[in-house]
Amino acid sequence: LTLERAELASEKGKGIKKDFKHNDFSNTTIIDILNEETAEKLGKAVGRYITIEIPELTFLSSDLPKIVETVKESLDLLLPHKNGLVLVAGVGNSDITADALGPFVASKILSTRHLSEDLQRSIGFSEPLRPVSAISTGVLGQTGLESSEYIKCIVNEINPCCVITIDALASRSVKRLGTTIQMSDTGIAPGSGINNKR
């Protein structure tokens, strides 16, 4: 987690900016890494990182609608504000529970790229849906392809305005497991949480 690296480094000054938001069900930390020197110290790329900590993150939570809205608002800070195609890429190994988040989420995405506006109207949508495509990349041991190779090929073919990549996240604290969402506009390094960088 970028939040943990910033805590460990106790980084202050011109190279980093932190903002905090708190409500009755979550804490959100927005960290902007502003220059290469700070990025190198933290081992993270220059960009924005949003960490949402939700102690009661379950599908059974009575706060679920508010949690979804909080995640949406944070995602809106990172996404381009236009109606272009979004590619959602779930990375990870669906056969290993701790690494299955990406493939699981990708399987739940409503893909709309193939739906014409006429068809959308005929099935009851009053406003056109944003075009979305979703894939699950698998892992090198399953496919013989690095996730990044697979995603790059698809990006070159369908030319989305952005890619949302979903992956499991490593944390130093057990309290953050299953309760923390990190988003960034910098991309990810699959496997980096277990020092598996290629």
Where would I find each of the regions flagged by the language model?
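Short glycine-rich or small-residue beta-strand-to-loop segments that form or flank ligand, phosphate
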Residues: T51-P55, L85-I96, A134-G138
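Gly/Ser/Thr-rich loops at beta-strand to alpha-helix junctions
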Residues: V91-L101, G141, A168-R172
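A structural-propensity feature for long, helix-poor, extended segments
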Residues: G124-V155
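Proline-aspartate-enriched helix->loop->beta-strand connector
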Residues: V155, P160-C161
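A structural signal for small-residue-enriched, beta-sheet-centric alpha/beta enzyme cores
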Residues: I135-S136, E149, T165-R198
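N-terminal amphipathic/basic leader segments beginning at the initiator methionine
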Residues: L1-V46
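An N-terminal, well-structured beta->alpha segment
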Residues: E37-H81
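Glycine-rich phosphate/diphosphate-binding loop of Rossmann-like nucleotide-binding domains
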Residues: N93-R130, A134
